[in-house]
Amino acid sequence: RGPNPNDTYYDMVDLAPYLSKGKNEVKFLLWYFGKSGFSHKSSGQSGMIFDSPSIGLVSDSSWLSQRLDAYRTAGKPVVNYRLSEANILYDARLEGQDGYKPSVELGEWGCKPWNNLILRPIPQWKDYGIKPLEYTVSNDGEGNTILTARLPYNAQMTPVIDLDAAEEGVLVKMETDHIMGGSEPCVRAEYITRKGSQKYESLGWMNGDELRVIYPENAGITFNSLGYRETGYNCEREGSFTSSDETINRFWEKAMRTLYVNMRDTYFDCPDRERAQWWGDVTILMGQSFYQLSPDVNALTKKAIQTHMY
């Protein structure tokens, strides 16, 4: 969660584009992992520090907060122990049933569990926007309908579903063809419907070449659309290569995609099973990035070197 096992990164965000003249209401959606992994050491407690003195907005007891019970942890199979996050389950039946309560001040800047706060050295993710997917419909022979959509390449993405449900309580599962990347369970998602029309984006990113949505046959579900939002490290492709051999050209493109899908808040060995900064993998990725990506990638390289000692 930070530059070392004890301290914490903070983000600097420009609120101006989100504010309008007059009264504004500011809301944050906080995801507390509640577990450690190869790339994250849990603080043991959820919390938020916010400080914008120029507009008199600070994170004190005047804030109201609520635990969103609609967000839960999905059942088995759970993610393997290497991953920092858990699989998200969202129960749409519980939307809007949570009440706000006064927040509790946990301590000042520099106190536990945050300790020293260090400005995050890399940019926020590059958001490519929501894009539609074409899909096929099949049955698995075990009572389930499966929507299968081919992604344009192996991407870091969040799935977006738009459907009508005749009844509430239908479990919809979302996963990719990399669900067992490296032979152990990786990130997937679950959604429980409410009755009527609904649209949902699962915010836990996953990766793969193919998105699959699974739900019971004859459950009264009608899908209106299926989509995805790709996000990734915020840089541009600048290096290029071409030849008269299409096989070599395709190989170069696949190598470029392999590089990009293995970088986010750090370089990592794989985007599915571990997402961890194994140095043997990092040195290969860093060397490639200098040739293929814009100088924005240098911030990620510097961060990798600085955190290597931990």
Question: Would you name each region that the model predicts?
Answer:
Residues I284-P295:
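Well-ordered alpha-helical scaffold segments within catalytic/enzyme domains
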